[in-house]
Swiss-Prot record:
A zinc finger (NR C4-type) spans 23-44, 60-94. The lineage of its organism: Eukaryota, Metazoa, Ecdysozoa, Nematoda, Chromadorea. One of its GO terms (cellular component) is nucleus. GO terms for biological process: regulation of transcription by RNA polymerase II. Residues 20-111 bind DNA. This is Nuclear hormone receptor family member nhr-199. Belongs to the nuclear hormone receptor family.
Length: 405
């Protein structure tokens, strides 16, 4: 097939020991073989890759009659050099058609992506060390939960009642604490007061955030998947307040709490679903939530927290480079980070913290006592030893304030 680029390539081959190859698509200087075409430039290769990966459909406004190659050339000695070209800014439909006409293969795009993924995975730990550490810690958290919550193999999830939630979060507190130690070694070096402050800010925020994320991952927008493997049915919130032994009778509070659960759904679940947040993005946001504590107990750690957050952002950008599916990684990063304010609205940074303990749990059995084992934390635990009814009533009041706007 006759093309201007092939003429240029033939002339260059005959006139120089080091010929300059020209792109068969746009006649700019080529840099190698791309997707089956012997000579193509990076710009045309990138254009073809994006079109194929995103299944873009371009339309020509001139019924496929665009004069695609509108280049002017200057003869310099025995070399022909393009002075200007507006080929790349012309009709995308005709440009894509030219790519196919010159031999670019759609199947080569996916094959190249797989090879790229394997190559980048070799240096994955070096490329995103913070996020990989977070993921390993999170995988350990998931494994630990099977034992902590006495989950049987292949046990079907069920909708839980309000009275069951305290035990779930009581057991979960120990697992989350271990997760923090594994994910952030810096956490273990903090003073006890600072550890507690960070844990207060993180625990319930993470539980709500993770429940929403898991609901999105399971394509179930009307449920909150809780750590035990069961769920809260947002579509039938009235069932959340009844069980075999007791019916919760404070109807006004029930309705308020049901509204707040729906607010959590709209403020956290919907944005996560809209952006189709993946596991690394979820862990990055979780890390930032922890590190944006209002605690000022240790100013030195606040400086360290800024560095860790910066490294999380760098890792996330490298993650986008690895998966190679977004045209603009910076735009994707901005879209994901824009979810944070919605999460922070629902997960207030107030000093109020929900302590869930039943009256049957002794101080020595409390997860906080097992974790911290000092007088201040023992006092913290003792203050939470109330009757189950009182705890449940406080839970309603807390949630109403917790997610109020």
């Amino acid at each position: 097939m006759f093309t201007l680029a092939r003429v240029l390539n033939n002339i260059g081959s005959a006139s120089s020991n080091e010929p300059i190859p020209y792109c068969l698509i746009c006649s700019e200087v080529a840099d190698g073989n791309h997707f089956g075409v012997a000579a193509a430039c990076r710009a045309c290769a990138a254009f073809f890759r994006r079109t194929v990966q995103h299944n873009k459909i371009h339309e020509c406004g001139r019924n496929g009659q665009c004069f695609f190659l509108s280049c002017k050339f200057l003869l310099v000695g025995f070399q022909i050099s393009p002075l200007s070209s507006d080929a790349r800014s012309m009709c995308k439909a005709c440009r894509y058609g030219k790519c196919l006409e010159m031999g670019m293969q759609r199947s080569s795009v996916q094959q190249r992506r797989e090879q790229l993924g394997k190559r980048l995975n070799i240096s994955d730990d070096r490329g995103k060390p913070v996020l990989n550490k977070l993921r390993r810690a999170y995988e350990m958290l998931i494994l630990n939960r099977k034992h902590v919550h006495n989950r049987r193999e292949n046990q079907a999830p069920r909708a839980i009642g309000f009275n069951e939630l305290p035990i779930v979060f009581q057991n979960e507190s120990t697992s989350i604490y271990q997760f923090l130690w594994e994910a952030f070694p810096e956490y273990s070096m903090l003073l006890p007061d600072t550890k507690l402050a960070f844990f207060k800010n993180f625990f319930l925020s993470f539980c709500l955030f993770e429940s929403s994320f898991n609901g999105c991952s399971a394509k179930q927008k009307n449920v909150m998947l809780i750590p035990s493997g069961d769920y809260i049915d947002l579509a039938h919130s009235e069932s959340f307040f009844t069980n075999d032994h007791q019916t919760f009778t404070e109807r006004d509070n029930i309705e308020i709490l049901a509204q707040r659960l729906k607010l959590i759904q709209s403020s956290i679940t919907v944005p996560l679903s809209a952006e189709n947040v993946d596991i690394y993005e979820f862990l990055a946001l979780a890390g930032i939530i922890l590190l944006e504590s209002d605690s000022e107990s240790e100013a030195d750690f606040q400086e360290e927290a800024v560095k860790i957050k910066s490294n999380i952002i760098k890792d996330l950008l490298f993650h986008y480079q690895c998966i190679n599916i977004y045209d603009d990684a910076a735009m994707r990063l901005g879209a994901v980070l824009s979810i944070l304010p919605s999460i922070q609205v629902c997960c207030s940074r107030s000093n109020n913290f929900l302590i869930i303990n039943s009256k049957d749990v002794s101080e020595s059995q409390s997860p906080f006592s097992r974790i911290h084992g000092n007088q201040k934390y023992a006092q913290f635990v003792r203050s939470s030893q109330e009757s189950l009814r009182h705890v449940l009533a406080n839970f309603i009041k807390f949630i109403c304030k917790f997610v109020s706007i």
